[in-house]
């Protein structure tokens, strides 16, 4: 019966993806927070978003108006080359699984969201879908104050909420005054409260760095202060309702605490493996053998200095792409929002990965799918410029903050 249901779902999804690619993309993006393993205990774990991503591949091959990965392609291939060289010398039982996982995010997700949309409208449902899921998870988290929400650990939920917060803030920035903007303001308040209650400091750091990236690109600090008038009181109220023990746990950095101690132990384990081969590391798959809560040290341990350099190049290539493209579009352009969200998500995920698991399902799918959206926007800007369309905006108009919070 289970196989019949799975087959029926796959067939229906294929039909939807071929007919409405925007809906298929939304089903990938907005279900990413649900990291629950659907493998049934198999050797390879996968979530509903990963299933949807793979089911959309036929639509990518048959219906995509273009097939691009963007400027990150060469750094990604370089990174995979270093990973292959390291793994050839230090093969592990989980090496293939890790390669598949990395390819799924860095190649398939990026290519899917960069290639399949016909226009920016095909991505709107994805963004609003994630905001809706974020509001749902935040409400449950705030009401129950449980360490698990719908079978998801609070750290995973916190990572997803930080992504939803970034998307909601950028959509609020870009929105026209009216009911839609008021709803986004309410969503921001709810998601912000849920993020706080999650007590995930990695998610807090990721959200902070993501928001800082948005501000650096938009340079609309006055408008952000108006948004803070809504967010800060709600966050303070949520904080006062937290139990004293939870507040102490969230603000404590004593090395004697088990969670802080575990982070230091993780770094020491990674350091030992890195010292065995500083150039190429000890092989991909090591992340499955210890509690890898620092992406920099994990990358050094698995692929050495060459791997860390290649991973840094991937992020630099994406940020350079966004910086180049955003100078050619106005801040009210939908393409600007896609560029800003892509950069903010990747920076957020990297910051989070410095203090927690980077390659965990959920937020990483959202981050690199957003990178694909930014790549789509980049190619759209190039197309407009090549066709002589006016994509610029008067500088004073672009920097003029909104007159009202709502």
Name every feature range the model reports, one short phrase each.
Residues 40-42, 88-97, 144-152, 196-197, ...:
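Membrane-interface helix caps and helix-loop-helix hairpins in membrane proteins
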Residues 193-199, 215-258, 266-276, 405:
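A membrane-periplasm/extracellular boundary helix in multi-pass inner-membrane enzymes
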Residues 2-9, 34-35, 45-62, 100-109, ...:
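Membrane-embedded alpha-helical segments of multi-pass membrane proteins
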Residues 148, 245, 253-306, 324-329:
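Long extracytoplasmic/lumenal interhelical loops at the membrane interface
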Residues 54-58, 339-350, 357-400, 406:
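Transmembrane alpha-helices of multi-pass inner-membrane enzymes
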Residues 2-6, 21-28, 42-50, 95-100, ...:
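Short, aromatic-rich membrane-interface segments at the entry and exit
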Residues 16-100, 104-107, 135-140, 180, ...:
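N-terminal hydrophobic segments of proteins, predominantly signal-anchor/transmembrane helices
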Residues 8-16, 80-87, 104-112, 118-219, ...:
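Alpha-helical transmembrane segments of multi-pass inner-membrane proteins
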